[in-house]
């Protein structure tokens, strides 16, 4: 019986040593993850970062683009309720795709990723994020209308 107990103890010790050795070997193989980038802590910081990455148009620039590039898609990312209430910028190629559904609906609306697109919202808070998203999706000619729909209306420019 003593031999049997001794054999079990020896077997347990061997198993523990093998597990420890294996764990020791794994620690050499495992590489710690790279340091995570600094987190952006405010929504405004996200908007500012998107604005820095995306070309911007003011009202005069948008008017010029609509005149010289009539194929430009004007993309309103406000909610349908906002558009129903106040209208939208008059443009030959207009789409209203809510910011939250943009990634899922843009390819059906604008399949050619080289199409010029100008994105806007009410006060240029959602549109920079949307324009940045379009660029990340591979759209190559995207701009943000930084003055927003509110300033377009104040200027008395055409709405539908």
Predicted regions and their residues:
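Sec-dependent N-terminal signal peptides
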Residues: 7-14
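Structural scaffold elements adjacent to functional motifs in cytosolic proteins
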Residues: 74-76
């Amino acid at each position: 019986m003593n031999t049997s107990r001794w054999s079990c103890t020896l077997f347990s010790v061997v198993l523990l040593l093998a597990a420890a050795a294996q764990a020791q070997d794994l620690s050499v193989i495992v590489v710690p993850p790279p340091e995570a980038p600094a987190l952006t802590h405010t929504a405004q910081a996200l908007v500012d970062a998107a604005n820095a990455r995306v070309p911007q148009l003011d009202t005069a620039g948008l008017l010029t683009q609509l005149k010289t590039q009539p194929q430009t898609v004007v993309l309103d990312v406000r909610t349908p309720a906002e558009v129903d209430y106040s209208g939208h910028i008059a443009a030959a190629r207009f789409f209203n795709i809510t910011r939250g559904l943009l990634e899922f609906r843009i390819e059906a609306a604008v399949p050619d990723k080289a199409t010029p697109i100008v994105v806007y919202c009410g006060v240029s808070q959602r549109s920079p994020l949307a324009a940045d998203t379009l660029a990340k999706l591979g759209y190559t000619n995207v701009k943000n209308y930084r003055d927003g729909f509110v300033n377009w209306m104040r200027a008395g420019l055409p709405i539908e």
